[in-house]
Amino acid sequence: MATLRIGSRGSQLALWQANHISALLRERGHEVELEIIKTTGDKILDVALAKVGTKGMFTKEIEEALAAGKVDVAVHSLKDLPTELPQGFELAAVTKRENPRDVFLSVKYDSISGLPQGAKVGTSSLRRQAQIKAIRPDLEIFPLRGNVDTRVRKLEQGEYDAIILAFAGLNRLGKTQLVKEIISEDVMCPAAGQGALGIEIRLGDTRMREILSFLNDYDARATTTAERALLNQLGGGCQVPIGAFAEVKDGQVHLTAICARPDGSEILRESKSGADPAHLGEEVGKTLLARGATKILEDVYSQNIAAPAQP
């Protein structure tokens, strides 16, 4: 049996994810080899993600290795994967999803509402920044880059009063000690695809598609398809102020999405249900565009908006 070669970023979380998939494949009798690949996003650590604004910044180099036949499978955080894959690739599986919500971490405080006026909050996400500013315009938002350990250490050292991260990554790494609040999706709409892994292969590789098919989770595939269709309709990547949260209930997909100004002064929110996830995402996206999302996104792109300078 040929060895399956998995391509992954080298961050602690990415390696956990790749090793998790490797273990599941080994349980089914496959030999697996891990190939660590450095991406553009791993090399640029001193600039806010929104400032960089490159789609595929955490996936491009891995896809190049996949195209060249150096690896057979690419394991990604689905939220990092562009909504339209480059020519020659396909999404073989979407894994069972972790809780997709964001969380509030702090040493001293229990919630966003409990922060003192002017408190420093760390995030490099315009989506998170906008939603924080909408409920607490007095808070100061500063960029936060680096791996999970680096971000938590900066919080513990007092550089920030609080930071906002995804629950999924913290939970996978067993680092939820400073989580004070899992933020409701009504307050902090998550990123499209957050909490799920996307397993990418070369287009038409039927052997790998069959091998990986057991990893597919129906609910995760349905919800993330709706969320990513919405994001694609708006023409956004993971660095724009767009949120999407879908759930499967009674055979229907329920999708809520937001498009926001980074300063939180305007947040458009739309919810809808349907049986076809891709069509649902497109419809919600069209509604948001008709309501003014086009202007918001034009302003974001034209101003190259990013979080303030590092404190």
Curated annotation (Swiss-Prot):
Catalytic activity as recorded in UniProt: 4 porphobilinogen + H2O = hydroxymethylbilane + 4 NH4(+)
Cross-referenced Gene3D superfamilies: Periplasmic binding protein-like II (3.40.190.10), Porphobilinogen deaminase, C-terminal domain (3.30.160.40)
Pathway terms, separated by semicolons: Porphyrin-containing compound metabolism; protoporphyrin-IX biosynthesis; coproporphyrinogen-III from 5-aminolevulinate: step 2/4
Species assigned in the record: Koribacter versatilis (strain Ellin345)
Function description: Tetrapolymerization of the monopyrrole PBG into the hydroxymethylbilane pre-uroporphyrinogen in several discrete steps.
PROSITE patterns the record matches: PORPHOBILINOGEN_DEAM
Any single Pfam family the record assigns to this protein: Porphobil_deam
Note: The porphobilinogen subunits are added to the dipyrromethane group.
Protein name per Swiss-Prot or TrEMBL: Porphobilinogen deaminase
EC number(s) on file: 2.5.1.61
GO cellular component: cytoplasm
Cofactor note: Binds 1 dipyrromethane group covalently.
Keyword Transferase listed: yes
Source organism superkingdom: Bacteria
Record-listed S-(dipyrrolylmethanemethyl)cysteine modification sites: 238
UniProt KW keywords: Porphyrin biosynthesis, Transferase
Any one GO BP annotation for this protein: protoporphyrinogen IX biosynthetic process
